Swiss-Prot record:
Its cofactor is a divalent metal cation. A divalent metal cation binds at D8, D9, S39, N91. GO terms for cellular component: cytoplasm. Keywords: Cytoplasm, Hydrolase, Metal-binding, Nucleotide-binding. Its EC number is 3.1.3.5. It is found in: Cytoplasm. The keyword Hydrolase applies. It catalyses: a ribonucleoside 5'-phosphate + H2O = a ribonucleoside + phosphate. Signal peptide: none annotated. The gene is surE. InterPro entries: SurE (IPR030048), SurE-like_Pase/nucleotidase (IPR002828), SurE-like_sf (IPR036523). It comes from Pseudomonas putida (strain W619). Binds 1 divalent metal cation per subunit. This is 5'-nucleotidase SurE.
Length: 249
């Protein structure tokens, strides 16, 4: 078993080291991660400059690109052997509901879809690393159990872990994505030379966070697992669209 590990917090992030440490004696692990924090990069690819991988003293490969770049190169010739699966994380911060649209952590796992199997993205609901050991233990157990799992090809499992010690985690729930309210307005700033700029505000609160959602599960102390797919076609809109298009052309 060969596992490609990536993240969006950057190659020196504690969550990446924790995930690698949890899996290194289970499988042959290769780490390719951004050389800096790329949170919010989504599934973007770098197309305006060459990418330069550098192998660090700990064996991790640092790349001047996005999480998707990292996995893309890892699956398309950078490595001597193609990985069997992609695992991403452990992100310090939630990736719940609409977060998956922007998340580089989730995007790295989505790029692993080309392997045909199941990829996993792990996030801890904290900006601090205190409970990373619990999250790493859970990640290891889920990666081990994944070998017994039969899901449709190209499924991604988005895993969010409560910020709790392992003994306080109540279990694991399969969930759907909730939804967030719109974020607050950006914060306007002015530099000493009078040039205006804006800081993007934090994500909105849960607007759809009831039972069955990922928001609800983690708030109740459960690990949330949400199966994701790349196909974002809104099938329920087909009938209305067909009717609307009659007579347009």
């Amino acid at each position: 078993m060969r596992i490609l590990i990536s993240n969006d917090d950057g190659v020196t992030a504690p969550g990446l080291a924790a995930l690698h440490g949890a899996l290194v004696d289970y499988a042959e692990c290769v780490v390719i991660a951004p050389d800096q924090d790329k949170s919010g990069a989504g599934s973007s690819l770098t197309l305006d400059r060459p990418l330069h991988p550098q192998t660090l003293a700990n064996g991790f490969i640092s790349l001047n690109g996005t999480p998707t770049d990292c996995v893309h190169l890892g699956l398309n010739g950078l490595l001597p052997e193609t990985p069997d699966m992609v695992v991403s994380g452990i992100n310090l911060g939630a990736n719940l509901g609409d977060d998956v649209i922007y998340s580089g952590t989730v995007a790295a796992a989505l790029e692993g879809r080309f392997l045909g199997g199941t990829s996993l993205a792990f996030s801890l609901l904290s900006r601090l690393p205190d409970n990373l050991p619990s999250a790493a233990f859970i990640a290891r157990r889920l990666v081990e159990a994944q070998s017994r799992l039969e899901l449709p090809p190209r499924t991604v499992l988005n895993v969010n872990i409560p910020n709790l010690p392992l003994e306080h985690i109540r279990g694991i729930q399969v969930t759907r994505l909730g939804h967030r309210a719109r974020a607050a307005a950006p914060t306007k700033v002015v530099n000493p030379r009078g040039k205006e700029g804006y800081w993007i505000a934090v994500a909105g609160d849960a607007e759809d966070g009831g039972p069955g959602t990922d928001f609800h599960a983690v708030m109740q102390g459960y690990v949330s697992i949400t199966p994701l797919q790349l196909d974002r076609t809104f099938n329920d809109a087909f009938e209305q669209l067909h009717g609307w298009l009659e007579g347009v052309l």
